[in-house]
Regions:
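Intrinsic-disorder-associated, low-complexity terminal segments enriched in Asp/Asn/His/Tyr and depleted
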Residues: 6-8, 17, 27
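Short, glycine/charged-enriched hinge/interface segments at domain edges or termini
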Residues: 39-58, 107-275, 406, 410, ...
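Flexible glycine/proline-rich
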Residues: 61, 74-83, 88, 134, ...
Length: 450
């Protein structure tokens, strides 16, 4: 999908593939870069090195965490703030409740009148009025009198106890009480829930429905929140047909764009799309100009002749990570273009899904207050079969749960998206684990939200 704002990013397919060279002067202390156009082919092509060195997943994550961009803020109505990240701390300026109130339906009385009440010598009090929520009873409560009170109604002056209806015996306009009651019983005090001056929500909190209720109760109707991270999606490939189009000839239909857009929205990002961009350096570079915090490129991340994106990023910005020790998604790239954090995800759909969850999604989730953890419910279960891996590589294995045991979904290829559809979730085999044995307990990340 292409947003209206992205119409200026379109680029015709018929351009000659040529690489515009840039010289990069990078200030490593501020992580900013200045670029001067040279108009010539780069002397060093990062693709020619292949993947001689692959970073560990931990190294890639550390690089991302050091480059998380900052977000601007905006003020929005309280009722629209669910799941948004609070930009500043909020302190209550009022007591909640702001008055003494009855916490039960019953009778407001003076505890001193009941001091000697017993079964053999009950105390009889005359009911002299009623008090309802929002309507205070202005006259002080006299000794040996009672006032019928509803839950939440203000306590009458001098009343310091509420006796529930079920604890008294009614006789016309009188109540009979056969036991003493401690002062303050069933009476809510000012500031009992929130005292004036209390820090109620800290900056950086992801706002929940109960938070909205509390903020409303202290008189707040709008909040300052972090803007949603703007994420621009660039899908490359001359072989791609638009999403939802039946495949034909030697073309394939774009599966990654709609999948990534859904993932970005799930993690709280605001997504725009350049649509399908041809494998042309100028077209890709033009798509990079979107005013966003994060750019995600699907396809063109490896070292093939048409994989221009790593070289473009190396020349025009900073290619911090290219190649990660994991399967699938090993051709992942991560870098900086001007102020934008850029993720290069493989074109194979399962690699794309895995690379998003581990890397791009992590950055978006941290920016939206969801935390860095994978956004899936976890379950510990035994393996129903062995799983082969190699030490030094992290593996992402799609699995099914059958009769309480975990087995692989086959085939496991990086292009086999149906394997993820048929899977209940996935298992991550750590770099240290190597192969896993039948019966070994593993954590399954279920393909369902936490």
């Amino acid at each position: 999908m292409q947003s209206k704002d992205d119409s200026n990013l379109r680029c015709p397919i018929g351009r000659v593939n040529r690489l515009i060279g840039w010289s990069v002067l990078a200030d490593r202390t501020t992580k900013k870069a200045m670029f001067s156009l040279r108009g010539q082919v780069s002397r060093h092509d990062v693709r020619m090195s292949g993947f001689a060195h692959r970073s560990s997943v931990a190294e890639a994550i550390a690089w991302i965490d050091s480059e998380i961009p900052s977000l601007q803020t905006e003020k929005i109505a309280l009722d629209r703030s669910t799941d948004r990240v609070l930009a500043q701390a909020i302190t209550s300026g009022v007591d909640v409740p702001g008055f003494r109130r009855g916490m039960m339906d019953g009778f407001a009385v003076r505890a001193s009148d009941l001091r000697k009440a017993s079964e053999s010598e009950p105390v009889v009090l005359r009911v002299v009025g009623d008090v309802y929520p929002g309507k205070p009873y202005s006259s002080p409560l006299s000794s040996m009198h009672a006032i019928r009170i509803m839950t939440g109604a203000p306590m009458p002056p001098e009343g310091d106890v509420v006796i529930p209806v079920e604890d008294v015996r009614l006789q016309d306009d009188q109540i009979v009480v056969s036991h003493p009651v401690a002062t303050g019983k069933h009476v809510g005090l000012p500031g009992e829930d929130v005292a004036s001056g209390t820090l109620v929500l800290a900056a950086g909190r992801r706002i929940r429905p109960q938070d909205i209720g509390l903020l409303s109760s202290i008189g707040i109707d709008a909040v300052e929140v972090l803007c949603k991270p703007r994420v621009h999606l660039i899908t490359t490939g001359n072989e791609l047909l638009p999403a939802g189009t039946p495949p034909k000839d030697f073309m394939i239909t774009d599966a990654n764009s709609p999948m990534l857009e859904s993932l970005i929205r799930r993690d709280g990002g605001y997504v725009t799309s350049a649509g399908i961009v041809p494998d042309d350096p100028e077209c890709i570079l033009k798509a990079f100009q979107a005013e966003v915090e994060i750019i995600i490129v699907s396809g063109g991340s490896s070292v093939g002749l048409e994989d221009h994106v790593p070289q473009l990023l190396a020349e025009h910005g900073e290619l911090g990570i290219h190649g990660v020790q994991m399967r699938p998604s090993s051709p992942v790239g991560i870098g900086i273009f001007k102020t934008r954090l850029v993720f290069l995800l493989p074109g194979n759909p399962v690699s794309c899904l895995c690379g998003y969850d581990f890397f791009a999604g992590r950055a978006i989730r941290k920016l939206t207050g969801r935390g860095a953890a994978l956004p899936y419910r976890e379950q510990r279960l035994p393996l129903g079969e062995s799983m082969l891996s190699v030490e030094g590589r992290k593996d992402y294995v799609r699995v099914q749960i059958e009769e309480g045991k975990v087995t692989k979904v086959m085939p496991q290829g990086a292009a086999m998206l149906f394997s993820a559809v048929r899977a209940d979730g996935f298992v991550v085999i750590s770099e240290e684990a190597g192969s896993l044995k039948t019966g070994e307990m593993v954590t399954v990340y279920l393909y369902e939200p936490r």
